[in-house]
Regions:
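Extended, highly charged
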Residues: 1-246, 251-261, 265-423
Length: 423
């Protein structure tokens, strides 16, 4: 499948729109529906799409219900598959190639006025070094025609880059914009060990579409999804430059940092290409970051009790807070679930545990469970001096934070009839 195959329900905007704040302003004014902008003033011949990957639209796009989502991702993590390789002549992404790289000619947007400039936020980076392949999300500030500055969080790609720099090497990369959503989901997952995320994407592609995931090889040897709208390739250089400010998932401005510079040698795209122009801090951003955390949290909690579902909350920006539904079989299941959930997603700051009768996607019902089933002095865990998230502006100067868990389940030995809602 291809990214564009999932845009059938999009509203097409034919009026001239600027990539400098224009897409963001239009989307905000219309309550962020699924949109395709086909008349971008600065980049004629190129379109842009926003707001595809909300939770509901994503599940509809890949043909599953929200209730099936977590278990489907967990299945793919346990059953990785091997993509198939196709010749570049059969790869849609190679339908057009720029004579010389000009990233300024494609619709990389400047959404928020507070951002440093034009940012590619929905593109994934595929990198390979010393026999290890990694695919992950990292925002990129467009510095000039063939350079971006990438925010590398301290995970596998940053480790790969640091190792290469220590050895006097560079890291070959490919940047992929608008592949099929299953590729984006796999890229958004985080693993403790080095796992080839493209094998997770291949498993999802086979399970959901009954077709193998097709890759094609670039001139620098890297393999990328053949149906992607845009692909550009190059390397992580030894140079650093300023990156940020940037409106992040919390809706607050992230810091200015010295970050690695990417240099690009080639750029290809499909006929009539559609750039995925994710708006930072909105629902699509929170979906891509938060939903892939749910199966890791569920897996961690399932090791200590029966976990039924996990929801990354909107108020927690899809990243810093979750509600976990369990089926309680022992008196301490709620407390164990808190500890396991926080361990399963180390950036999370707050977790609430509820019983199986609570709709965890409804904040009113979760709050109802809190006020009717939770006693603050005995059902609360506070953990101090924990590793914090760089996305949390309240973290301490050394990067640590405290974390909290609420056990809003009915006491195990209580008469449950008095706790059940009749509404």
């Amino acid at each position: 499948m291809a990214f564009r195959d999932h845009l059938g329900a999009a509203e097409t905007i034919s009026q001239p729109i600027s990539l400098i704040h224009g897409m963001w302003e239009y989307s905000k004014a219309s309550q962020h529906p699924l949109l395709v902008f086909e008349n971008i003033v600065e980049t004629p011949g190129h379109k842009a799409a926003v707001n595809l990957l909300t939770r509901e639209r994503l599940c509809a796009a890949i043909g599953i219900t929200p209730e099936e989502y977590i278990d489907t991702l967990a299945w793919a993590m346990e059953n990785p598959s091997v993509p198939v390789l196709v010749d570049s002549n059969d790869a849609e992404c190679f339908q057009n190639q720029q004579d010389s790289v000009d990233l300024e000619a494609i619709p990389i947007p400047h959404h928020w006025p507070q951002d440093r400039g034009r940012y590619s936020s929905a593109s994934v980076i595929i990198a390979q070094y010393d026999g290890i392949r990694n695919m992950s999300f990292h925002r990129q500030f467009l510095r000039d025609k063939n350079h971006t500055v990438v925010r590398l969080v301290p995970r596998h790609l940053r480790t790969m880059m640091s190792t290469a720099r220590a050895n006097g090497d560079t890291v070959d990369i490919a940047v992929v914009n608008a592949p099929d959503p299953v590729v984006l989901l796999a890229a958004a997952m985080s693993f403790d060990e080095n796992i080839d995320e493209l094998t997770i994407a291949a498993a999802l592609h086979e399970k959901l579409y009954n077709q193998p995931l097709r890759l094609t090889k670039l001139p620098n040897g890297l393999e990328v999804p053949a149906s992607a709208e845009y692909v550009f390739w190059g390397k992580i250089t030894a140079e650093n430059d300023d990156e940020g400010p940037y409106v992040d998932i919390t809706g607050t401005l992230d810091d200015v940092r010295q970050e690695p510079v990417l240099e690009f040698d080639g750029l290809v795209h499909r006929d009539n290409p559609i750039f995925h122009a994710l708006i930072p801090g909105e629902a699509e951003h929170k979906t891509l970051m938060g939903l892939p955390r749910s199966p890791t949290i569920k897996d961690a909690v399932s090791k200590v009790c029966e976990c039924l579902d996990v929801h990354m909350t909107e108020g927690g920006c899809g990243w810093l807070a979750a509600v976990v539904k369990i089926r309680k079989k022992h008196h301490d299941d709620g407390i164990k679930a808190i500890e396991a959930a926080l361990a399963g997603h180390r950036s999370m700051k707050m977790v609430t545990i509820v019983d199986e009768d609570i709709d965890i996607a409804d904040p009113v019902r979760v709050e109802w469970a809190m006020v009717t089933r939770w006693q603050p002095d005995k059902d609360t865990i506070i953990l101090s001096n924990q590793k914090g998230s760089s996305l949390d502006p309240s973290r301490y100067p050394d990067g640590t934070t405290s974390k909290v868990g609420f056990d809003a389940t009915i006491s195990f030995d209580a008469d449950k009839s008095g706790f059940m809602s009749v509404q």
